[in-house]
């Protein structure tokens, strides 16, 4: 950021500022996939390519979506990970099976199980990438890896993790301590909105509050 203050002949000050960025790469790639996608609605997605200023530039992007390994059971994330573990993972799971050992809930640490779909797209074509009928997504955790080359031939890689849930199913989409979903994010007067709660734990009590502004309805 550069700030310039100039005084004119009348002694009045005028301020002007400009911002700029410096980067080792001239291309950024991203996608339109949300952190949590609804199974029935996940039929297409887009891939974007931009320069450092955020302006669109055409690029050929290779992409691949992978299914990730799920934990064997749900765990609650610890408030703070120990600097040094005094127990092995196996010992900890026997002592505190519901309390995470460290990285169980971190998607970035999950192993890849299988490749679901892959392809290549030129971002000059703004048509969304359709998920074919032969591609079978299920509820769970996924990872998309995208690769492209900038104008200097440097390879750019972007990785994003996401989950797929099914609001029509009575089963948990994946092992987790709590699950909350709405049938719609907005509604008109007289409409009905279904609220779904879930947990992989048994004998769970749910406390909830419905508010309008700061006033509690329920």
Sequence positions of predicted segments:
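A structural signal for beta-strand and strand-to-loop patches characteristic of beta-rich domains
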Residues: 1-218
